[in-house]
């Protein structure tokens, strides 16, 4: 057995027992899966959602998975070798529409799933720099084959730019204090390790929330900025309206307020709920003819984890699942 295959098998064993997909069953139920359907898992990760989707498809069903993380793609390719219903692509979900066009399935996809959270194996891999609790190189890129690392950005960004990122992406009230300390520190020593960044942030915050690590918001902000996460989410949401078939489902799991706000307002903007009072004596066709620019989605609703799931997996506490269905008009 070659070393790479052995590594993947060991790693799959590790993630099977360490990574818990949040709202796993709820997400798959929300997709309302048809056995012969075509589905897209836009964030393959450790493959938990993809495996459950595949278990509900028959021989004619298909699943396309996408991930920016090269290790996730390696794991996915191992599954693809054993199941010809499954394909995985190394890409960002913001480019999903290009891949769907390439296979001629625009307007024919029955469901899109996006799990916007960072995976356990990414957090636990010290070399990635995502964790403020472990020491490692400060990278933070989802795709290590492109873009600049967090360390590179911190070495060049102005104090004003760092402040803006921490405030707007992390909603960090002490953004100015943190930016000032980071710029002062880098004059003498490059900030290239996650534990160093974490300590500097802690030193900059005068009042601490005992229930949350002081570096939580700043690490989130830098990660989201480095990976262009909000713009990519906005792009895939817009494209989903074109990709989905009539009655196709869009299911998104968010883990912070900025992501959830984007998803919530997108669904509201493209559904009829904002502009049409309930119980009007009108058919769907009549409503659509009057409000066709807005009425493209039906808001199915939102779900949050149970107390039992949060107890089993603390990562679940901030998760919100939102689901919408493309109108069949």
From Swiss-Prot:
Gene Ontology CC terms, in alphabetical order: cytoplasm
Entry's Gene Ontology BP terms: rRNA base methylation
Swiss-Prot/TrEMBL keywords: Cytoplasm, Methyltransferase, rRNA processing, S-adenosyl-L-methionine, Transferase
Molecular-function GO terms, alphabetical: rRNA (cytosine-N4-)-methyltransferase activity
Transmembrane segments: none
Enzyme nomenclature, EC number: 2.1.1.199
Family annotation (InterPro entries): RsmH, SAM-dep_MeTrfase_MraW_recog, SAM-dependent_MTases_sf
Pfam families linked to this entry: Methyltransf_5
Binding-site list for S-adenosyl-L-methionine: 47-49, 67, 93, 115, 122
Location of this chain's protein in the cell: Cytoplasm
Enzyme class at the top of the EC tree: transferase
The reaction(s) this protein catalyses: cytidine(1402) in 16S rRNA + S-adenosyl-L-methionine = N(4)-methylcytidine(1402) in 16S rRNA + S-adenosyl-L-homocysteine + H(+)
Keyword S-adenosyl-L-methionine: yes
HAMAP family named among the record's database cross-references: 16SrRNA_methyltr_H
Family as reported in the entry's similarity comment: Belongs to the methyltransferase superfamily. RsmH family.
The protein's role, per its UniProt record: Specifically methylates the N4 position of cytidine in position 1402 (C1402) of 16S rRNA.
The protein, known as: Ribosomal RNA small subunit methyltransferase H
Species assigned in the record: Blochmanniella pennsylvanica (strain BPEN)
Gene behind this protein: rsmH
